[in-house]
Amino acid sequence: MAKRGMLIVLSGPSGVGKGTVRKEIFSQPGNKFHYSVSMTTREMRPGEVNGKDYYFVSKEEFEQEIAAGQMLEYAQYVDNYYGTPLKYVNEMLDSGKDVFLEIEVKGAMQVREKAPDGLFIFLTPPDLMELRQRIINRGTDDIDTINKRMKKAVDEIEMMQNYDYAVVNDEVEKAAEKIKTIIRAERWRVKRFLPDYRKQLGELN
């Protein structure tokens, strides 16, 4: 039976660059992470691809998935649902593959409760003014939505204490490399290393 894979959760406030950093990690040679595509009810942005960036569904479809217990986590953010389908994540982990989630902070806290052995990384901006400018530069939100996102961001940064590691996204390439370094180190933590040895010892007895 394959050793169970590691669940890696990257989250942070809206506009911090989670998607950009995740894409940088996945674009590098030798990448073996499996990206769990999130589901959302928000409208597709220019350049996004259904099934690659997100699964874009209606509110009714999303709520049906919730009712059926098919979401690992979900949250409602600025009037839209975001969440992670459960089936794919479990299939990948059980087959020994490492699964990479890029999700909202509220959703990450739900995953923390259900999968406490996951690796939780908080991506943070250099400062709040930089975060506001990044949201404005996206050109997808009106001023009211930008203000909502900033208020939410302040609350989310306070939740950083619930994560294992924090990475400042001042430069995408540097942030991606820091995250890869964290993951490499995490593999050798005793709590991840010891279960396999105990299993081997049990087989000898």
From Swiss-Prot:
One of its GO terms (cellular component) is cytosol. Residues 5-184 form the Guanylate kinase-like domain. Belongs to the guanylate kinase family. This is Guanylate kinase. Its main location: cytoplasm. PROSITE patterns: GUANYLATE_KINASE_1, GUANYLATE_KINASE_2. GO terms for molecular function: ATP binding; guanylate kinase activity. It is found in: Cytoplasm. ATP binds at G12, P13, S14, G15, V16, G17, K18, G19. It catalyses: GMP + ATP = GDP + ADP. Pfam families: Guanylate_kin. Keywords: ATP-binding, Cytoplasm, Kinase, Nucleotide-binding, Transferase. InterPro entries: GK/Ca_channel_bsu (IPR008145), Guanylate_kin-like_dom (IPR008144), Guanylate_kinase (IPR017665), Guanylate_kinase_CS (IPR020590), P-loop_NTPase (IPR027417). The keyword ATP-binding applies. PANTHER family: GUANYLATE KINASE, GUANYLATE KINASE-RELATED. Essential for recycling GMP and indirectly, cGMP. Its EC number is 2.7.4.8. HAMAP family: Guanylate_kinase (MF_00328).
